[in-house]
């Protein structure tokens, strides 16, 4: 049943109907549409459109319909209804007869769909926050188990300074904390109810919209009806949250793909998250991580697409806004799947400590320690930087590590260098000296793990 038609003398072309209908994707809003309809039925009692008995009949029928939807949501797709709103109304009329036709009094699909989508977004934010926290927990547990796994830290994908695998894990805990914070901020702004704003000018019935908002679990009601039915900022914000979150997951995936490569060989991934080659029997490919990295692009595309959809729209509602759902649903589904998959990747990962340490001892990652040593001896840092650069060139020429150079070799670059330099150049010393908050010293990493556990578990 179409919710309109009196104005038209011809039926819609079937091709237009298929082009126009949205049930194939907005069926996902069925629960929210029913919940909103129950609240609206209560509001209609307060203005005399429904009596208490009628409202009870509607609510009972809607409750039964909600149970049916929860049991088999995909059954909705067998209908030829235009959208989820017309599907719910048709099913309601089937259950209660003409009484069901009274429910839409004073309500438009414009405020109805805006309400449904916000309710769905609120639930989805909770799901995403839970998944973010679960990944953070997996990272913290992996960090705790690998505090002694020394590995190279990189800049420009070149070995820079030694870090630990635990410190690497904790870096992503911080990124995910910002992701969770962004979701919480988004929730604060979307937590206002548009229901009761009608098509664009507000409802003609003196409904207490603040009370209605409370029944639906919103913090308050919106303040302007034109804005309320036009607003899709929450869609853009959630797509932005997802885009940033997927960038973080893509970087996480890229790091582990490199760490797992034969060239680095820092970690082994579980067989449960890898696959083989149809031709090369020796291959063990990091497909889970590559798919996380690859799916980042589709989420970025959804954000760009929605931004372009909205940028030229006049107030108030336009059919263009129907395009808000498919990209949002796909982007948030993708982000949620990738969060779960990233946690699964960490479950069973093996850090190859000897290889990590070997790599950390190569590439002159202790060069900064020699510069700091010279500064402690009174050499200005810029001069010390130049001296160490020359020493590295000599070490490369001899094919040795800095700490393997003879004292006489080092002293040709600076006479202040003494025997006490060698303990400074030791790998563990490089870590131990990073004692400021956020550093890679064992004490700071242990403290960061303890703080994260207190916050996340």
From Swiss-Prot:
Listed CDD domains: Argininosuccinate_lyase
What is the E.C. number? 4.3.2.1
Keywords for this protein: Amino-acid biosynthesis, Arginine biosynthesis, Cytoplasm, Lyase
The UniProt entry, under Gene3D superfamilies, shows:
Fumarase/aspartase (C-terminal domain), Fumarase/aspartase (Central domain), Fumarase/aspartase (N-terminal domain)
**A Pfam family this protein belongs to?**
ASL_C2
* Known catalytic reactions: 2-(N(omega)-L-arginino)succinate = fumarate + L-arginine
Tell me one GO molecular function of this protein. Answer: argininosuccinate lyase activity
Q: What is its main location?
A: cytoplasm
What EC class is this?
lyase
Q: Pathway it belongs to?
A: Amino-acid biosynthesis; L-arginine biosynthesis; L-arginine from L-ornithine and carbamoyl phosphate: step 3/3
GO BP term, example: arginine biosynthetic process via ornithine
Q: Does the keyword Cytoplasm apply?
A: yes
Instruction: Provide the protein's localization.
Output: Cytoplasm
Q: Which family does it belong to?
A: Belongs to the lyase 1 family. Argininosuccinate lyase subfamily.
Q: What is this protein called?
A: Argininosuccinate lyase
Q: Which organism is it from?
A: Yersinia pestis
């Amino acid at each position: 049943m179409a919710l309109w038609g009196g104005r038209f003398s011809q039926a819609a072309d079937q091709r237009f109907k298929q082009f126009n209908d949205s049930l194939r994707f907005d069926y996902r809003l069925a629960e929210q549409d029913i919940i909103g309809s129950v609240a609206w039925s209560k509001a209609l009692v307060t203005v005399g459109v429904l009596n208490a008995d009628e409202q009870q009949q509607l609510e009972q029928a809607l409750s039964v319909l909600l149970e049916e939807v929860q049991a088999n949501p995909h059954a909705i797709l067998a209908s030829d209804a235009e959208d989820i709103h017309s599907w719910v109304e048709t099913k309601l009329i089937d259950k209660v007869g003409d009484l069901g036709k009274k429910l839409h009094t004073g309500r438009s699909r414009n405020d109805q769909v805006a309400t449904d989508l916000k309710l769905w977004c609120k639930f989805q934010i909770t799901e995403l926050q839970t998944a973010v926290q679960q990944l953070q927990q997996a990272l913290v547990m992996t960090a705790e188990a690998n505090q002694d796994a020394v590995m190279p830290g990189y800049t420009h994908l070149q070995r820079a300074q030694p870090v630990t695998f635990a410190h690497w894990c904790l870096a992503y805990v911080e990124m995910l904390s910002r992701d969770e914070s962004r979701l919480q901020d988004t929730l604060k702004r979307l937590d206002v109810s548009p229901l009761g704003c009608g098509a664009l000018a507000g409802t003609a019935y003196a409904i207490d919209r603040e009370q209605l908002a409370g029944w639906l679990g919103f913090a308050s009601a919106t303040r302007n009806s034109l804005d309320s039915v036009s607003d899709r900022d929450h869609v853009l914000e959630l797509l932005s949250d997802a885009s940033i979150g997927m960038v973080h997951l893509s970087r996480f995936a890229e790091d582990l793909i490199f760490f797992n490569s034969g060239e680095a060989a820092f970690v082994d991934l579980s067989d449960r998250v890898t696959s083989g080659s149809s031709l090369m029997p020796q291959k063990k490919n990091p497909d889970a991580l590559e798919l996380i990295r690859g799916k980042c692009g589709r989420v970025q595309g959804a954000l760009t697409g929605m931004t372009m959809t909205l940028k030229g729209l006049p107030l108030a509602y336009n059919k263009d806004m129907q395009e808000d759902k498919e990209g949002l649903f796909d982007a948030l589904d993708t982000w949620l799947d990738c969060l779960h998959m990233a946690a699964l990747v960490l479950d069973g990962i093996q850090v190859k400590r000897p290889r990590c340490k070997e790599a950390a001892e190569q590439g002159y990652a202790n060069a900064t320690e020699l510069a700091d040593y010279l500064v402690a001896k009174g050499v200005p840092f810029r001069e010390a930087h130049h001296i160490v650069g020359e020493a590295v060139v000599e070490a490369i020429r001899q094919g040795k590590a800095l700490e393997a150079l003879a004292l006489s070799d080092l002293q040709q670059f600076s006479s202040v260098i003494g025997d006490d330099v060698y303990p400074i150049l030791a790998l563990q010393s490089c870590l131990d000296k990073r004692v400021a908050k956020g550093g890679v010293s064992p004490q700071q990493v242990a403290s960061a793990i303890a703080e994260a556990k207190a916050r996340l578990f």
